Amino acid sequence: MNSKIKTAVKALVSTMFFIVLMTNAATAQEKDKATEGAKVVTTQMKSQLALNDSQYTKVMDVNKTFLQKAAEAEKGTTNATEKAKKIKMFTDERDSKLKSVLTETQYKTYTANKAAYGKKFREFYQ
C-alpha cells in the first residue's frame, strides 16, 4: 500500500510540474506575440507619423503594454460586454499615453488612422 501511495504522489507531482511548465510556455508565447504586434504596429506608426527615436521607444512600450492587457482580457473574460469594456478602457489609456508622447500634428494623424491601427492590433490579441 505504501508503494502505491508513493507512486501516486510521484505521478501527481510530475503532472503538476508539467502543467506549470506548459503554463509558463503559454505565457511566454503571449508576451512574444505582444512584442511582435507592438513592433509591427509601431513600425507602421513610425513611417506614418514620422516618429523620432525617442518617440518610437515610448510608443513601442505603450503599444506592447496595450497588447498584453488586451490579450489578458481576451483570454480571461468570457462575457463579450465585459471584454469590450476592458478593451475600450485599455484603448483610452493607450490614447492618453500616446497623446503625451506625440506632437499635436502626429496625434491628429494617429486619430485619423486609428481604425487601421485597431484592426492591426486585433490580429495580435484575438
Describe each PLM feature range.
Residues 2-3, 27-126:
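Charge-rich (acidic/polar
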Residues 1-33:
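Bacterial Sec-dependent N-terminal signal peptides
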